[in-house]
UniProtKB/Swiss-Prot annotation:
InterPro entries: AB_hydrolase_1, AB_hydrolase_fold, SHCHC_synthase_MenH. The gene is menH. It holds the Pfam family Abhydrolase_1. It comes from Serratia proteamaculans (strain 568). The keyword Hydrolase does not apply. This is 2-succinyl-6-hydroxy-2,4-cyclohexadiene-1-carboxylate synthase. It is an enzyme of class 4 (lyase).
Length: 255
């Protein structure tokens, strides 16, 4: 079973917000944003290999989707929104397309890739993620994290935010992170764009104004896009006030 943390009880008649963190994160990642949505009950999940779910094994997207469903059932949650960042966003998209749909009210994605349509691209990405996984298993975590956050997708991080992320992520277990990275590699994820376009529930993708790559990915996938100003890939960290405002607006007016 996945470890969880109830961030707030909210109002009993509202659906729950289920918060899914990115790779290397934990249930604390969404705390600031959830606090700006106090009307909604909020449950943050530790994904396999992370936080208090460090010993939980995950072998595939189907696996984590089933684990999420079991976790919601354990908590008696019948109506919910999924909110996911990066890896958490990809998991949320997969769950919405291939998981148990009962009770899902909508999906809010931050910087999540809907998938690669080209098989050759998927093979390249799987090799890329496998190489990173080997580094997480074999090298000192501090060194791997320092290199991880120098990747182009994180180019807009300020030095302060980059150092803070490295510090916060340093208590991860490298081997557990590696296992989850391989199990949920973008190279093993199907292209979800066609199904996401036909979802029976509302969906939106939030991207930082400076995250041009993921803005284009979202447009190419034909998905609804909203821009968070003064932010890059990790827009909920860079501009929490604006991110929370966009999220709240969509929850209230999902059409």
């Amino acid at each position: 079973m996945l470890a969880t943390k109830v961030l707030q009880q909210g109002e009993a008649d509202r659906p729950w917000l289920i918060w899914l963190h990115g790779l290397l994160g934990n249930n604390n990642e969404w705390r600031v944003i959830a606090s700006r949505c106090p009307e909604w009950p909020s449950l943050a999940i530790d994904l396999p290999g992370h936080g208090d779910s460090v010993a939980v094994v995950c072998t595939s997207f189907d696996d984590i989707s089933a684990q999420i469903s079991a976790t919601l059932q354990m908590h008696g949650i019948e109506r919910y929104w999924l909110v996911g960042y990066s890896l958490g966003g990809r998991i949320a998209m997969y769950h919405a397309c291939h998981g148990e749909p009962r009770g899902l009210q909508g999906v809010i994605i931050e910087g999540g890739n809907p998938g690669l349509a080209d098989a050759a691209q998927r093979e390249l990405r799987l090799a890329h993620d496998t190489a990173w996984a080997e580094r997480f298993r074999r090298e000192p975590l501090a060194q791997v994290l320092a290199d991880w956050y120098q990747q182009p997708v994180f180019a807009n991080l300020s030095a302060v935010h980059r150092d803070a992320l490295i510090d916060a992520r340093s208590d991860n277990a490298g081997a557990a992170v590696a296992d989850m990275l391989e199990a949920t590699s973008l190279g093993t994820q199907p292209c979800l764009a066609p199904q996401l376009q036909q979802l029976a529930v509302p969906l939106v993708v939030l991207c930082g104004a400076d995250d041009h790559k993921f803005q284009q990915l979202t447009r190419d996938a034909g998905l609804p896009l909203r821009i968070v100003p003064q932010a890059g890939h990790n827009s909920h960290l860079a501009n929490p006030q604006a991110f929370a405002a966009e999220l709240r607006n969509f929850l209230v007016n999902p059409g």
